[in-house]
Regions:
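Conserved AMP-binding/adenylate-forming core of the ANL superfamily
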Residues: 20-21, 38-72, 78-84, 88-92, ...
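Gly/Ser/Thr-rich phosphate-binding loop
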Residues: 277, 297-304, 314-375, 388
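AMP-binding/adenylate-forming catalytic core of the ANL superfamily
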Residues: 125-129, 411, 416-417, 424-427, ...
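Conserved ATP/PPi-binding loop(s) of AMP-dependent carboxylate-activating enzymes
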Residues: 382-386, 397-428, 466
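Conserved AMP-binding/adenylation subdomain of ANL enzymes
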Residues: 232-252, 262-301, 316
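Conserved adenylate-forming
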Residues: 68-71, 193-206, 211-255, 277
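A short helix-loop-beta submotif of the ANL/AMP-binding
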Residues: 75-76, 82-102, 106-110, 118-124, ...
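ANL superfamily adenylate-forming
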Residues: 7, 138-205
Length: 557
């Protein structure tokens, strides 16, 4: 496919990146530590660590893994923590020691955790004590030999830390009881590591850095094998994209999305650590009052989120009290941002939501809107530098400009494959190195892409293709709607019919009122046949609404 999108690039943005700049993620972070040593790196609950401090602690942790646990190169180490100061220390330490990090959602059920630990073959895990009880339930059935337990208070000094841990454990009772023999505290690991001499491990771009498990929105989670080169490439692609708008050592970034998710890991951790930014870690973004309170403490310049987070924010009166005078960039990804939400965000903050698109298998960034847009575009923008895309029909042939087709991607950010799944890898990546995304998109004559929907979410009503994103976009415009999801359900007359799940913003909303609203905005076959009101909708760890779960629930009724 001709690279039409290059003509639409922002002035000064190069079409290719130089991947040879870095040999590994450890190389990236080492250079940041040297260049921005005394600058604040990570802040959490009022405690700040400089780049030099994080670098020292990460090396201490790497030394513990290397000298005390004696883990061989390539061994898998799981991380089961939310956004706390120990997360970047553990991640950079694991990678520095030549090991492979396995990001694990701390909110996993025992079944989900067991699958991931067994599938990855992890032998060591770093877990925040709040979630150790889940680990205890599955531990005997995994290959885990070493358990390192972190606590929220341990990074805050002896007196303050002890007080914090007492409140968390005894007053708020946020640490369920667990019994795991022979655990080591994170602080002990750091001390024992510091007492030994770390021997640097030479890494290459082809070495595996992460086993990043797909979000489970498409079934059983698979481990995407992401190399140091994959992550470094995506970081450089993004850095090239943002260079006209953001400046080294001067940005303050909110990290509300979990760092164990690839979107936050690459964007929040890699890109902004590489540019010497101050990264404010939000441990529990569901505590919206506390989150907004954190935003009020100091002006931020970058906000990264997903539609559900933006939606929750703009519907809080206290969000308008935040100082947005320094906000330069709001980056949206993970799911489609709805226009109604984007318009409210722009009205309150003064900055548009810049929509990006990616997937775990691409580290994750594939496309992004230019940062100089004036308003939300409704599309996913342009392929980032050194990235090729093709839109194909069901027979694998390229579709004409303006016609919907499945998006395929090729670039240095595309994964090596799925962990221990050669057949799945062969299905996902073709002989030319293009990755199948499973997403339907349309490209215009200037190379701009608009995502239509997931191929698997397509609903066929009386032979007509209906994309649930379009229906959700329309329903979300209604002022009485807070959240919405659309699925297809079996129907004798039409094959499938549309069912919409809605969380009300205004309790007076009725089904009849909403159907009438849809009739005024949609052609007849796109009007939902059934509306179900819910108190909440099922979501993934980053807030993506899980249509698959809603389909399963509808089938079981």
């Amino acid at each position: 496919m001709e690279k039409l999108w290059l003509k639409s690039y922002e002035q000064g943005v190069n079409s290719e990146i130089d991947i040879s700049q870095y040999s590994s993620i450890s190389d990236v972070f080492r250079q940041s530590v040297e260049k921005f040593a005394d600058k604040p790196a990570f802040q959490n609950m009022g405690k700040t660590l400089t780049y030099a401090e994080v670098g020292k602690l990460a090396t201490d942790f790497a030394s513990y893994l290397q000298n005390v646990l004696k883990l061989p190169r390539g061994e898998r180490v799981a991380i089961m923590m939310p956004n706390v100061l120990q997360y970047p220390i553990a991640l950079f330490g694991i990678l520095q020691a030549g090991l492979v990090a396995v990001n694990t959602n701390p909110l996993y059920t025992p079944r989900e955790l067991e699958h991931q630990l067994k599938d990855s073959g992890a032998t060591t895990i770093v877990v925040l004590e709040n979630f150790a009880n889940t680990l205890e339930l599955v531990l005997p059935r995994t290959q885990i030999k070493h358990v390192i337990v972190a606590s929220v208070g341990e990074m805050f000094g002896m007196i303050k830390g002890a007080l914090m841990n007492f409140v968390i454990r005894k007053v708020k009772k946020m640490v369920p009881e667990y019994r795991i023999p022979n655990t080591v505290t994170f602080q002990t690991a750091l001390k024992q590591g510091a007492a030994n001499s770390f021997k640097p491990v030479e890494l290459t771009r082809d070495d595996t850095a992460l086993l990043q498990y797909t979000g489970g929105t498409t079934g059983l989670a698979k481990g995407a094998v992401l190399s140091h080169g994959n992550i470094c490439a995506n970081m450089l692609q993004a850095k090239e994209w943002i260079k006209n708008s953001l400046h080294e050592g001067k940005e303050t970034v909110i990290a509300a999305l979990p760092l164990y998710h690839i979107f936050a890991l690459t964007v929040n951790l890699m890109i902004f650590a590489n540019t010497g930014s101050k990264i404010i870690l939000i441990t529990n973004p569901r505590d919206m009052k506390g989150f907004v309170g954190e935003l009020k403490k100091e002006p931020i310049s970058v906000f990264i989120g997903v539609n559900t987070l933006f939606n929750a924010m703009v519907n809080r009166p206290d969000f308008a009290e935040v100082d947005f005078s320094r906000l330069k960039l709001t980056l949206g990804g993970g799911m489609a941002t709805q226009r109604a939400v984007a318009e409210k965000w722009k009205k309150i903050t003064g900055t548009p939501i810049v929509e990006a698109y990616g997937l775990t298998e691409a580290s994750p960034g594939v496309c992004c809107n230019p940062l100089n847009i004036e308003a939300y575009s409704g599309g996913i923008g342009l392929p980032v530098p050194s990235t090729e895309v093709e839109l194909r029909d069901a027979d694998g042939k390229e579709v004409p400009i303006g016609q919907p087709g499945e998006l395929w991607v090729r670039g240095p950010q595309v994964m090596k494959g799925y962990w221990n799944r050669p057949e799945e890898t062969a299905k996902a990546i073709d002989a030319r190195g293009f990755l199948e995304t499973g997403d339907i998109a349309v490209m215009d004559e200037k190379g701009w892409l608009k995502l239509v929907d997931r191929k698997k979410d397509l609903i066929v009503v009386s032979g007509f293709n209906v994309y649930p994103n379009e229906i959700e976009e329309v329903v979300a415009v209604n002022d009485k709607v807070l959240e919405v999801a659309c699925i297809g359900v079996p129907n004798e007359k039409t094959g499938e019919a549309l069912k919409v799940f809605v969380v009300k913003k205004d309790s007076s909303l009725t089904k009849e009122e909403l159907i009438e609203f849809c009739r005024s905005e949609l052609t007849a076959y796109k009007v939902p046949k059934d509306i179900e009101f819910r108190d909440e909708l099922p979501k993934s760890n980053v807030g993506k609404i899980l249509r698959r779960e809603l389909r399963e629930q509808a089938q079981n009724k």
